[in-house]
Amino acid sequence: SDPAQAQLTWQIIVGTLGPFVRVIVSVLGSVLVGHSPHLNIDVHDDKSTFHRFDKFNLKYNPCGQSRLREIFLKQDNLIQGRFLGELTKQVFSDLAASKYQMAEYRVSIYGRKQSEWDQLASWIVNNDLYSENVVWLIQIPRLYNIYKEMGIVTSFQNMLDNIFLPLFEVTVDPDSHPHLHIFLKQVVGLDLVDDESKPERRPTKHMPTPAEWTNIFNPAFSYYVYYCYANLYTLNKLRESKGMAAIKFRPHAGEAGDIDHLAATFLTCHNIAHGINLRKSPVLQYLYYLAQIGLAMSPLSNNSLFLDYHRNPFPMFFSRGLNVSLSTDDPLQIHLTKEPLVEEYSIAASVWKLSSCDLCEIARNSVLQSGFSHVLKSHWIGQRYYKRGPEGNDIHKTNVPHIRVEFRHMIWKEEMQQVYLGEANIPEEVDK
């Protein structure tokens, strides 16, 4: 759009909203005299916005326009993301005050142009967005069809190049993208996101290569997964050769849609978000158990969008020994308090009657699944946390009894030996 028109739009919106916000705060101030710490402009979605993921997504763009989101929740706008930067610092401050909560925040790279990485990294560095309580994941929305229709990209390969070429360039020569080099030290994972319930064509061996994919149709979930994994695998080998940390593949999967999504992520990912559709496939569920692939589950989010809380498979997965943890998803819309993670744990404990031992084990799983450094994990759950079985459990830090860890490890080893006919090569360490 025309910059002058965009600037005018910005001035109109600010001019319209400014007095409105000031009036509300003024009225609240007159009611809550002497209680100014309680004043805020928190919002929460009405329940009618849930039930359908496509309708839920539309609420990010009121009246079909993304202007409000661009102003307040984007880093590449006319004010260079200053508002979002200040908001993020406040969240960092709250996490530091809580002391015992760490977060893995997600920011988006869309693949529309290669300069997105530098814009995002500059926003992080220029706003000094660093916290010992936070690491970052990059989420890639699966929106090729939209970009193709708009004429932004010419092929799927064009989108992949926009996502991965800057990463290869900065790995080979950090001086080529100095801000990105700094930012990537805080990036621990790559995520794929979008509505999994959308109908899609099943992938076949006759599908075109990314360079040949020039039609307007969106590739299947597994197509995205394979090519993102292939590029990330090569990138990580290069980063490891340079002494840099690997970036793990940790997509959203199994929240809805085809069960094949979970088969694709089983072959490629480090861990996944959600995975509730594993309840429909005992075979895949067993494979995820044997591989101990982490499932970061969000029952309250699922309850609002896809699956009633009492039907959530989390307690079944946990009792069977799958590597599950509790996490938050869309806390601004889903949760009702300033402690969304506490909400997840407290409601799960209450509804499913989880013991204190259960909660401690789930919290330990959460640390193991996370992308935080070896030093921090050693500080939180013990120096030998990466060892399997009781040897890797420091009861003084995890509060998980040795007998619980030993039982889990013994059953898992027996299952592995059963599958491999007594010749299983049991790894002694978990993936750090």
Label for each model-derived stretch:
Residues 1-432:
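Metal-cofactor-binding active-site regions of metalloenzymes
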